[in-house]
Amino acid sequence: MPGSIRIDIVTALPALVEEPLQHSILQRAQESDVATLQVHNLREYATDKHRQVDDRPFGGGAGMVLKPEPLFRAVEAIEGAAGEADDIIYLTPDGARLDQSMANRLSMEGHLILIAGHYKGIDQRVRDLLVTREVSIGDVVLSGGELPALMLVDAVVRLVPGALGDSSSALTDAFQDGLLGAPVYTRPAEFRGHEVPSVLRSGDHQAIARWRDEKRLEKTRDRRPDLLPDTNNDSTEASSQ
């Protein structure tokens, strides 16, 4: 029985991707039919005897570029077997920034195909004619798109109903409501002179909720003020009325 979300990853380096999919939440999601995760070796879709998937860029320059033919064949074969994808995503530094809002939206789609670029990138015609969404993990360049693809898979699958043992866990993650997470503690209650805040041991659930909300707001204001409403603009607008 197929999972409620299917994600296919196309890569020239499948070994970088396959192993992490067999652990923790991603493994359990597959075993419980919540997710179907498939890795496709791009070289299997090359037709020359050397299984070449890259070539030198027109116009010169350093680096190699992934060829369009194998990428088109791979995506067309996947869609021929599993149906049309809701999104064909290329992982690239110049894509839209992956955030919790995007992960939430993607978790509601039924079928995603991820293209992990490598070398200098992929032929622009693949981006123009095949890709429907381009995603970045931030302003940093990695050797390839395999690690970003894994990050996207993990961020999305854990939001699919049934992926987590406690479904409320995903709802309390950082960024779900625009704030960073509160500090968390476990046993022992005292460690090297540092004690767990007494409110967390009080059993007063309302007080605990207030404490966590205060700490989340405090941390967000300190570390990521960009996530908070622009109170300065609000006050300026109010004073001008």
UniProtKB/Swiss-Prot annotation:
Top-level EC class as recorded in UniProt: transferase
| Reaction(s) catalysed by this chain's protein | guanosine(37) in tRNA + S-adenosyl-L-methionine = N(1)-methylguanosine(37) in tRNA + S-adenosyl-L-homocysteine + H(+)
Subcellular localization is given as: Cytoplasm
Q: In the record, which residues are listed under signal peptide?
A: none
What is the E.C. number? 2.1.1.228
Binding sites annotated in the UniProt record for S-adenosyl-L-methionine: 117
Q: Give the CC-aspect GO terms.
A: cytosol
Biased composition of type Polar residues is found at 230-241
Task: Offer one example of a GO biological process linked to this entry.
Answer: tRNA N1-guanine methylation
Entry keyword set? Cytoplasm, Methyltransferase, S-adenosyl-L-methionine, Transferase, tRNA processing
Please give the superkingdom of this protein's source.
Bacteria
InterPro entries in the record, alphabetically? Alpha/beta_knot_MTases, tRNA_m1G_MeTrfase_C_sf, tRNA_m1G_MeTrfase_TrmD, tRNA_m1G_MTases_N, tRNA_MeTrfase_TRMD/TRM10
Q: What is its main location?
A: cytoplasm
Record flagged with keyword S-adenosyl-L-methionine: yes
Q: Where is the composition biased (Basic and acidic residues)?
A: 211-227
Database matches in Pfam families: tRNA_m1G_MT (PF01746)
Chain intervals for the UniProt region annotation (Disordered): 211-241
GO MF term list: tRNA (guanine(37)-N1)-methyltransferase activity
Q: Which family does it belong to?
A: Belongs to the RNA methyltransferase TrmD family.
Quaternary structure (record): Homodimer.
Its biological purpose is as follows:
Specifically methylates guanosine-37 in various tRNAs.
Please report the name of this protein according to its UniProt entry.
tRNA (guanine-N(1)-)-methyltransferase
